[in-house]
């Protein structure tokens, strides 16, 4: 069984190592939440903030970044199977965690203690390591979600009526919906 250790790149004697808080989210935890984006999953963890940055004026979603302890995404190192994740675009050096599909993630390790002595200055806030599972074959999964809001808050409606604001009433159907389809293929070449 393969073991990946986040927080140390140096071989050490058993029982001796760096003491730092590590949060681990397993594939089962990810499935239980129903989240399909790593950004949403990481937002549920303490001391983690994620953000969408758009560098294009046409409304592009941009890159999803990770910020540990509020020190900024440039101070949080993002690893993919123990290796640095490439920058998310030409306008930033910050990795885009939207590139990582939830369907292949085995676990996510979040080292919230500073790890700059091990990884360098971009790990001052900590390290997020995405560990993927080996896929041999073909997998497909999908999901659908929708939400509806009927503006039924009587207090807000009263304020809007007093000011003669127009607002939708009754059953207006779905206000929003989202579809998700993940296709994963893989094989062992060795």
Predicted regions and their residues:
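Non-catalytic regulatory/gating segments with a bias toward low-complexity or hydrophobic composition
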Residues: 22, 30, 42, 108-109, ...
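Short, polar/charged loop or turn motifs at beta-strand boundaries
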Residues: 2, 20-40, 65-71, 94-98, ...
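Extracytoplasmic beta-strand/coil segments of soluble accessory domains associated
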Residues: 11-12, 39, 43-84, 129
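Transmembrane beta-strands of outer-membrane beta-barrel pores
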Residues: 58, 86, 114, 144-148
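Short strand-turn segments of transmembrane beta-barrel domains in outer membranes
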Residues: 127, 135-186
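N-terminal periplasmic "start-of-domain" segments of outer-membrane beta-barrel proteins
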Residues: 3-33, 60, 88, 138-141, ...
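Short acidic/polar hinge/loop motifs at secondary-structure boundaries
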Residues: 83-112, 158-159, 173
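N-terminal periplasmic accessory domains that precede
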Residues: 38-41, 64-66, 96-98, 122-142, ...
């Amino acid at each position: 069984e393969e073991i990946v250790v986040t927080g140390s790149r140096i071989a050490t004697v058993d029982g001796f190592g760096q003491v730092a808080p590590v949060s681990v989210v397993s594939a089962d935890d990810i499935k239980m939440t129903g989240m399909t984006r790593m950004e949403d999953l990481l937002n549920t963890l303490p001391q983690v903030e994620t953000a969408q940055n758009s560098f294009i004026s046409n409304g592009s979603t941009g890159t999803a970044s990770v910020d540990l302890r509020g020190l900024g995404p440039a101070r949080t190192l993002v690893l993919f199977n123990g290796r640095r994740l490439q920058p998310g675009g030409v306008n930033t050096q910050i990795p885009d965690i939207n590139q990582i599909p939830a369907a292949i993630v085995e676990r996510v390790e979040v080292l919230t203690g500073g790890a700059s002595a091990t990884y360098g200055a971009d790990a001052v806030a900590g390290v997020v390591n995405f560990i993927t599972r080996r896929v041999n074959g073909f997998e497909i999964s999908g999901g659908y979600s929708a939400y509806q809001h009927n503006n039924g808050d009587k207090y807000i409606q009263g304020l809007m009526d007093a000011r003669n604001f127009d607002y939708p009433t009754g059953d207006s159907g779905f206000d929003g919906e989202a579809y998700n389809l993940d296709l994963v293929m893989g094989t062992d070449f060795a």
